[in-house]
């Protein structure tokens, strides 16, 4: 199935989904809507997965290494999209990452050590993704 069909399939079980094409454009795949997985790079496939998750319009979104297969610029674009979506849609977005440099964008940072929460810090002034470098 195409990238668009992949996202649309996931929306069949949702009460209040977002438009598949719109979300695919938001993740930078507006020109790849009708491409099949074999025609997409690993990073593009990851963005289809992110689009599928965002299009479901959940109250909580768990993102495990959302920038793992992405280049620096695309990774920042996706993090910015997640940050903006969190704010605009009042969605809780949990980002699990080994990249501690992106912690300043978070409202709250939970550091895990040996499978347990080692610390929990609230960030009163989250930084925009554009201002973060790694």
Sequence positions of predicted segments:
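ABC family nucleotide-binding domain
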Residues: 1-105, 111-112
């Amino acid at each position: 199935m195409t990238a668009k069909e992949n996202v649309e399939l996931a929306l069949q079980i949702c009460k209040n989904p977002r438009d598949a094409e719109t979300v695919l454009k938001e993740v930078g795949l507006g020109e790849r809507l009708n491409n099949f997985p074999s025609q997409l790079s690993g990073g593009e496939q990851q963005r289809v997965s992110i689009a599928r998750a965002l299009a479901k319009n959940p109250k909580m979104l768990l993102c495990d290494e959302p920038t793992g297969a992405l280049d620096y610029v695309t990774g920042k674009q996706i993090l910015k999209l997640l940050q903006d979506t969190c704010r605009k849609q009042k969605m809780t977005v949990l980002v699990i990452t080994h990249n501690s440099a992106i912690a300043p964008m978070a409202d709250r940072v939970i550091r895990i050590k040996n499978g347990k929460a080692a610390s929990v810090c609230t960030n009163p002034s989250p930084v925009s993704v554009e201002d973060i470098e790694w």
